């Protein structure tokens, strides 16, 4: 069984990795638990520090930020893994939605899991479930194949 939990209690000398979902359009969608997590961790690893800085400023969160973007994901994952092993509590966020779901994060989550680091899911807004909820469909099964490619014209 993997070290994955849903609470903010820590009984381990190692750090924990919090995978925190962020708003997909309305800052009011961020949960109290996500705000508490972002406020109390030692470091926030984010896809784009400029974007996350705006979110933190809006919520008066002063936790230090470190960039964690796709082009440097392997290198940054190693750096963050060392911090986790040293006992740091780290939140991982993407610009909008859930890290590792069509956004950076899977490499760090995998490395943390392999190293025995506890991983805590802090659920939040989801574009796909929001779209399904208002589509009027009665489907119980669906497939998410990722985002459409960016229009380059």
Question: Residue locations for each model-derived region?
Answer:
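Generic beta-sheet signal
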Residues: 16-20, 87-94, 142
């Amino acid at each position: 069984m993997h070290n994955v939990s849903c609470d903010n209690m820590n009984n381990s000398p190692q750090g924990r990795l919090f995978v925190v979902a962020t708003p997909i359009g309305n800052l009011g969608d961020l949960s109290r638990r996500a705000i508490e997590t972002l406020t109390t961790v030692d470091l926030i690893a984010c896809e784009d520090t400029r974007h996350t800085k705006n979110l933190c400023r809006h919520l008066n969160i002063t936790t230090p930020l470190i960039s964690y973007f796709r082009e440097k994901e392997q290198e940054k994952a190693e750096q963050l893994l060392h911090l986790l092993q040293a006992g740091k509590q780290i939140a991982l966020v993407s610009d909008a939605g859930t890290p590792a779901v069509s956004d950076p994060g899977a490499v760090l989550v995998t490395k943390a899991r392999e190293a025995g680091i506890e991983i805590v899911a802090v659920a939040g807004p989801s574009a796909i479930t929001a779209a399904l909820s208002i589509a009027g469909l009665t489907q119980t099964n669906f497939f998410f194949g990722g985002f459409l490619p960016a229009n380059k014209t």
